[in-house]
Swiss-Prot record:
Gene3D superfamilies registered for this protein in UniProt: Mitochondrial import inner membrane translocase subunit tim13 like domains
GO molecular function annotations of the record: metal ion binding
Protein topology in the membrane: Peripheral membrane protein
Oligomeric form and interacting partners: Heterohexamer; composed of 3 copies of TIM8 and 3 copies of TIM13, named soluble 70 kDa complex. Associates with the TIM22 complex, whose core is composed of TIM22 and TIM54. Interacts with the transmembrane regions of multi-pass transmembrane proteins in transit.
Protein's name according to its UniProt entry: Mitochondrial import inner membrane translocase subunit TIM13
One annotated Gene Ontology cellular component of this protein: mitochondrial inner membrane
A Pfam family the protein falls into: zf-Tim10_DDP
Annotated TM spans: none
Comment on protein domains: The twin CX3C motif contains 4 conserved Cys residues that form 2 disulfide bonds in the mitochondrial intermembrane space. However, during the transit of TIM13 from cytoplasm into mitochondrion, the Cys residues probably coordinate zinc, thereby preventing folding and allowing its transfer across mitochondrial outer membrane.
Residue ranges of the motif Twin CX3C motif: 34-57
Residue ranges of coiled coil: none
Gene: TIM13
Length: 82
């Protein structure tokens, strides 16, 4: 393996680890934000209203996350000249 291949492998591994951290962060924020908003009094199960609220909240949060991520990636590409 030459130095170019080693560098590419390291970059790929770092990107995968960063993606994993981002996914974990997203899940944690979804749980915190949506659960606090939609489930004021936790019980043994979610009511239909709580389930609907959680679904809606998660969809909105994911859409916002994707929008921010896309803008961030576009900016990185622009700055790197791609």
């Amino acid at each position: 393996m030459d130095s170019t291949q080693v560098k590419a492998a390291v970059i790929k591994q770092v990107q995968q680890e960063a993606n994993l951290v981002n996914a974990r962060t997203l899940i944690e924020k979804l749980q915190e934000t949506c659960f606090e908003k939609c489930v004021p009094k936790p019980g043994t199960s979610l009511s239909s209203g709580e389930t609907t609220c959680m679904t809606s909240c998660m969809e909105k949060y994911m859409a916002a996350w994707n929008m921010v991520n896309s803008a961030y990636i576009a900016r990185l590409r622009q700055e790197s000249g791609h």
